[in-house]
Amino acid sequence: MNPTFQDIILTLQRYWGERGCALLQPYDMEVGAGTSHTATFLRALGPEPWKAAYVQPSRRPKDGRYGENPNRLQHYYQFQVVLKPAPADILELYLGSLEALGFDLRKNDVRFVEDDWENPTLGAWGLGWEVWLNGMEVTQFTYFQQVGGIDCKPITGEITYGLERLAMYLQGVESVFDLRWTDGLTYRDVYHQNEVEQSAYNFEHSDVGFLLTAFSAHEKKAQELMVAQLALPAYEQVLKAAHTFNLLDARGAISVTERAAYIGRIRNLARSVAKSYLDSRARLGFPMAPRAWADEVLANIEKQTQKKAAAA
């Protein structure tokens, strides 16, 4: 029998756990993608090695369709794998995970389609590929080049599986709501009402005045927390601001020019938080990094600090 939705998650957790990844839990806030989890966005910064895997519920208010579209949702799941430094055999590891899920690679058409990734609101970009399985995109591969405007060294490899799409292919269904979550329970049973009601909230009932005030409040608090050298709480305020922006965008409450300005404000915050986090790890001496890597980065930071002081 084809694997259930939860079987797929358990198989991926087991596979990556056996390959040295820390199996983490989802970030407990509204985020638009697994990349926004601190285990990816912040851990990609600096010289400290990191291997983690986790499921991340992802919210994109604008994509809601009141539960009427068979493959478009405002809330869905990603399975995220982060490998730093990116291993030379990352593609082979990924293909191994497909085999673990039950794909026969000799009988299925797996294609890597070049697709460099960018997230303007996080000031992040990377070189990468979409993975197409028999004509359907199921995974995004990225080698991070920058996060929060800061160069990534060593390079972090990110693998993002679209769990619903993988499951639809494995189970041979045309609608996400027909997926078997587990025996006797469908995706419709678990999430259809949520899609209907959250779509109504996102498009009709969110309070625009409140959201506009909330965005500015989160922005201000993030800035205050960075002054206090509290990078992680500051980052949470950035995530709150980003989700608030997404709700405003879904509501049609901001114009095209305002939209660009809001994205710029979030990007500036993300850049500041990235630097604040890197500084906080530097103050600790990058304790998880090989000594030579840590010393090199600390020396570069010291050099930049002296250069700024001389220019002042």
UniProtKB/Swiss-Prot annotation:
- Known catalytic reactions: tRNA(Gly) + glycine + ATP = glycyl-tRNA(Gly) + AMP + diphosphate
Family listed: Belongs to the class-II aminoacyl-tRNA synthetase family.
Query: Organism, per UniProt?
Result: Thiobacillus denitrificans (strain ATCC 25259 / T1)
Keyword terms of this UniProt record: Aminoacyl-tRNA synthetase, ATP-binding, Cytoplasm, Ligase, Nucleotide-binding, Protein biosynthesis
Biological process terms in GO annotation? glycyl-tRNA aminoacylation
Quote the SUPFAM superfamilies the UniProt record gives.
Class II aaRS and biotin synthetases (SSF55681)
- Which Enzyme Commission numbers does its entry carry? 6.1.1.14
Instruction: From the Swiss-Prot or TrEMBL record, state where the protein is found.
Output: Cytoplasm
Cysteines joined through disulfide linkages: none
What is the protein name given in its UniProt record? Glycine--tRNA ligase alpha subunit
User: Gene3D superfamilies attached here?
Assistant: Bira Bifunctional Protein, Domain 2, Class II aaRS and biotin synthetases, domain 2
Q: Does Metal-binding show up as a keyword for this record?
A: no
CDD domains for the chain: GlyRS_alpha_core
- Give the GO cellular component terms, alphabetically: cytosol
Transmembrane ranges, per UniProt, are none
Tell me how this protein assembles: Tetramer of two alpha and two beta subunits.
Q: Name one GO molecular function term.
A: glycine-tRNA ligase activity
Keyword Glycosyltransferase in record = no
